[in-house]
Amino acid sequence: MDYGRTRRKRLLMNGSDESENQYAQHYVEFLETMSYTKFGVCAVCGFSCQVQYHFGGVVCGACSAFFRRTVSLNIRYLCDGDNQCKSMLKKCRACRFESCVKTAGMKRSLVRRKKPTIKTTPLYIKNRETHVRNEDVLRAFIPSYTHPSPANETVEDKGKFSEKLKLSHGNILKFYINQVRYAKRKNTNIFTIKTTEDFMRLVNFQRKIADETCSSFPGVELIDENNILILRKYLQFSSVWIESTWTYWITNSSVSVDNMEMDKRLKELIEHVKSTLLISLSQLKLNIFEFAAFKSFFVWKLVFHKTSVAMKTIGQEHYECVSSALKSYYQTYTSMDSTEIAVRIGEITLLLSLVFVSKIDLKSKSSELNFQQIYHDMAKLYVHLGLPF
């Protein structure tokens, strides 16, 4: 017998001496203890099967498990079809997760997240062979669910953990590497677009990624919403312009922007980025580890907008952790000595300093990198094209 529904109907139709608070308490207790299972259609996958209340929505067990795993492990899926795939269950997990939230009404807050007690393998494997590929190095980032004994931990591994960000230095660098790897795989950037509409689609796509990525940034829970909005601006700018430039260089692409159907201001800005940033990155020849570090430095440089002391503190923590992880990478996977490592990191830092030169005469030094000018020109362009900024 459905006690909860019968009691609710009797109270509503016949009245009761119980107060509204008492009724609410009874009904909440009913909702918490009820077992609602029936044969129906899952709101997510559309299959006819046994459905039940899971995390705020009536779905099948498979979609419930998919939603719980995605949220608890903080997985972010991305869709090539702008989250409009028709065959969600079989092909696109991004659309399946979006359907869980928007169609079924499932709530992330009802999922218990995994406790951060999982041990991870060391960031780098001891190997000084010069022919080791980047893909082999990245395998050292894969989490391990085993619990190594203290005897297997080296002295240099101790102390490489950020108490503020609650992550090891290596995992923080890994966070940025994963972003760069996805952008490289997509191979869509400002230098391969042919029309203004292509550019607007690229910006909107990167804005969506920035919105999703910001929520998973290490330490983002320590800053307020206004500063998170600023972080999104920096992240979107770095993805559209800086990351696109590096991806364009690393893939050895060659696309001319002459006679393309695009806005004049957009074409001029692309040419300016190509003649400054592209040249600077091609001279340094940054690999994926170095560029991921450079991107993290840029995102947290925080000079274009006024930010709080808390955000500056988190930014400094990111800089120190990523710098430490990058140094360990050089020591482990290259034959560079301490002096060469210092020089290399200095070159990357120098590029960052050129990025934020505030006073440069573009007429007399048109080939010198000036990101403040690029950032301001980008803001004006977005307003001109009607893009939110």
UniProtKB/Swiss-Prot annotation:
Domain of life per record = Eukaryota
Domain NR LBD: from-to ranges: 157-388
Any Pfam family: zf-C4
An example Gene Ontology CC term for this record = nucleus
Q: Which UniProt keywords apply?
A: DNA-binding, Metal-binding, Nucleus, Receptor, Transcription, Transcription regulation, Zinc, Zinc-finger
Recorded hits in InterPro entries, A to Z, give: NHR-like_dom_sf, Nucl_hrmn_rcpt_lig-bd, Znf_hrmn_rcpt, Znf_NHR/GATA
By sequence similarity, the record places it as follows:
Belongs to the nuclear hormone receptor family.
Keyword hit for ATP-binding: no
Record-annotated DNA-binding residue ranges: 39-113
- In which compartments does the protein localize? Nucleus
| Protein name from the UniProt record | Nuclear hormone receptor family member nhr-164
MF terms in GO: DNA-binding transcription factor activity; sequence-specific DNA binding; zinc ion binding
**Which species does the entry assign this protein to?**
Caenorhabditis elegans
The answer to whether the entry has keyword rRNA processing is no
- Physiological role: Orphan nuclear receptor.
Start and end residues of each NR C4-type zinc finger?
A: 42-63, 79-95
Membrane-traversing stretches: none
